[in-house]
Amino acid sequence: IGTLYFMFGIWAGLVGTSLSLMIRTELGKPGSLLNDDQLYNVVVTAHGFIMIFFMVMPIMIGGFGNWLVPLMLGAPDMAFPRMNNMSFWLLPPSLTLLLASSAVESGAGTGWTVYPPLSSNLSHAGPSVDLAIFSLHLAGISSILGAINFITTIMNMRWEGLLMERLSLFVWSVFITAILLLLSLPVLAGAITMLLTDRNFNTTFFDPSGGGDPILYQHLFWF
């Protein structure tokens, strides 16, 4: 699975790099190249999501983690190999949803933070933002399952006599990262789910006209 993570991360990295090149050519000279601000915003948004959720996290945590953590603990495999499998296979459909979101209507041109009111159903009436939110949900589930797996593996699968203070710093870094991920990702999930209901079920979590607060989204997102 570690190898699959690497392959997936490299592929997503190539997609992200091509988006990055579009951004650089647009900004590299005066005047407009794409002649469409919405399209540029969509490229920036997709670039942010792809590079974080589909390149950096799968390669740095999924790839290196799966290869090195069991090796450094003296464990035969991760604590939950089948959950590990599921963590990986949630990513391709997630990436597909993200790419679909940029193809539907005029794409999700909200910036990678998906801030309201830019992501409200007034600014983006079509399903593009909803698809992006579903994509984030899948990527988040994958990350949370992976984090649970890493924490359990590091706590329970060490060689006898391999105390926590004798662990390599790489294992510690994965351990701490997984704990922080497990704390913060559900908050982001709550924020984007509230945004989803704002868009589709007439709630007003982030809509000032209904007593909501768009700054609340920023608090939840950046937590």
From Swiss-Prot:
Pathway: Energy metabolism; oxidative phosphorylation. One of its GO terms (biological process) is electron transport coupled proton transport. Keywords: Calcium, Copper, Electron transport, Heme, Iron, Membrane, Metal-binding, Mitochondrion, Mitochondrion inner membrane, Respiratory chain, Translocase, Transmembrane, Transmembrane helix, Transport. Its cofactor is heme; Cu cation. It is a multi-pass membrane protein. It is found in: Mitochondrion inner membrane. Binds 2 heme A groups non-covalently per subunit. Residues 28-46, 112-130 are mitochondrial intermembrane. The keyword Magnesium does not apply. It comes from the Eukaryota. The chain crosses the membrane at residues 5-27, 47-69, 89-111, 131-153, 174-196. Residues 1-4, 70-88, 154-173 are mitochondrial matrix. It catalyses: 4 Fe(II)-[cytochrome c] + O2 + 8 H(+)(in) = 4 Fe(III)-[cytochrome c] + 2 H2O + 4 H(+)(out). PANTHER family: CYTOCHROME C OXIDASE SUBUNIT 1 (PTHR10422:SF18). Component of the cytochrome c oxidase (complex IV, CIV), a multisubunit enzyme composed of a catalytic core of 3 subunits and several supernumerary subunits. The complex exists as a monomer or a dimer and forms supercomplexes (SCs) in the inner mitochondrial membrane with ubiquinol-cytochrome c oxidoreductase (cytochrome b-c1 complex, complex III, CIII). This is Cytochrome c oxidase subunit 1. It comes from Doryteuthis pealeii (Longfin inshore squid). The gene is COI.
